[in-house]
Curated annotation (Swiss-Prot):
Homodimer. The active site is at 65 (proton acceptor). It catalyses: Endonucleolytic cleavage of RNA, removing extra 3' nucleotides from tRNA precursor, generating 3' termini of tRNAs. A 3'-hydroxy group is left at the tRNA terminus and a 5'-phosphoryl group is left at the trailer molecule. HAMAP family: RNase_Z_BN (MF_01818). This is Ribonuclease Z. Its EC number is 3.1.26.11. Zn(2+) 1 binds at residues 61, 63, 140, 211. The keyword Disulfide bond does not apply. It comes from Bradyrhizobium sp. (strain ORS 278). The gene is rnz. Belongs to the RNase Z family.
Length: 301
């Protein structure tokens, strides 16, 4: 299960109601920040999530509206005397932006907190314990951008009726079966996992795409996602302008969701030039299971 807290949902210019981009994903005891726009500290506090115990930051790309919150966040963590190592993941170009930004404030090779900078490559898979994060390339103007597939595996659960029928006692022996290993009961009978486990279920797939100028190449990554979060900066009537600035229209985002058999579509990176109702109408005409993200929205998948 993944819990999402939308911290910033604006396009490059923030508004009264929308902060610069940032999204917190919580799952399996992990707290992962996707993008770190200006003002992210206050958004974390206002959301109730807080900014301590962040496990890592994933950056979709290095444009300033997605990374300018990093220095302030790191400075506050230093004041809080955080000893945890912060891992920041992004493309080589994005990591270079972070390095230069930190160097301008604290000097070459220095940072205010323990820091691990991790350049990403397309196809790289990050192990987050209870789930994995597949990193894939995204096209957005002059950047080497990334999208992220969060995948929790389907699991088989113990069937109470089978446990009772086979007289399997409570305790560690049941955990052994749940972990996939056979056990021997006190009376000598051998019980295997196949005897007491149900069919696989419960696996989830969350896909997050930041700024992108095309849906080409994204189909394989979004296919079958329970939830797709993706930008929709323009409407289709302004598709030429969308191309010029390297962004999608709401119609294009919806078409991608429809072709990928996505469960739910959440539109993000919202421009103040359009009423939300108009953006939503364009997308829902193609993919009805669409909503627009707002700051401090919480979703669970």
């Amino acid at each position: 299960m993944f819990e999402l807290i939308f911290l910033g949902t604006s396009a490059s210019v923030p508004s009264h109601d929308r902060n610069h981009p940032g999204l917190l994903v919580q799952a399996g005891g992990q707290r992962i920040l996707v993008d770190c726009g200006e003002g992210i500290q206050r958004q974390l506090l206002a959301s109730g999530a807080g900014f301590r115990r962040l496990d890592r930051i994933l950056l979709t790309h290095g444009h300033l509206d997605h990374v300018l919150g990093i220095p302030g966040l790191f400075s506050t963590l230093r004041l809080r005397r955080s000893a945890d190592v912060m891992s920041v993941h992004g493309s080589p170009g994005t990591i270079d932006v972070v390095i230069r930004m930190l160097a301008g404030l604290w000097g070459d090779g220095r940072a205010p907190i323990p820091l691990e900078l991790v350049p990403l490559t397309p196809g790289q898979v990050l192990d987050a314990g209870a789930f994995t994060i597949n990193c894939f390339a995204v096209r957005h103007r002059d950047t080497d951008s990334f999208g992220f597939e969060f995948v929790s595996p389907a699991r088989r659960h113990l069937l109470p009726e089978r446990l009772a029928a086979l007289a399997v006692p409570d305790g560690p022996i049941r955990k052994t079966l749940a972990d996939g290993y056979p056990v021997t009961l006190d009376d000598g009978r051998i019980v295997t996992p196949e005897d007491v486990l149900g069919t696989p279920g419960g696996g989830k797939k969350l896909v997050i795409v930041g700024d992108t100028e095309t849906t080409d190449g994204l189909q394989a990554h979004v296919r079958g996602a329970d939830l797709l979060v993706i930008e929709a900066t323009f409407l289709q009537r302004d598709s030429a302008t969308a191309r010029d600035y390297g962004h999608l229209t709401a119609a294009e985002a919806a078409a991608l969701a429809a072709s990928g058999n996505v469960g739910q579509l959440v539109l993000n990176h919202i421009s103040g030039r359009y009423p939300d109702e108009e953006i939503l109408a364009e997308a829902r005409s193609i993919f009805p299971a669409t909503r627009i993200a707002s700051d401090f929205d919480r979703l669970t998948v």
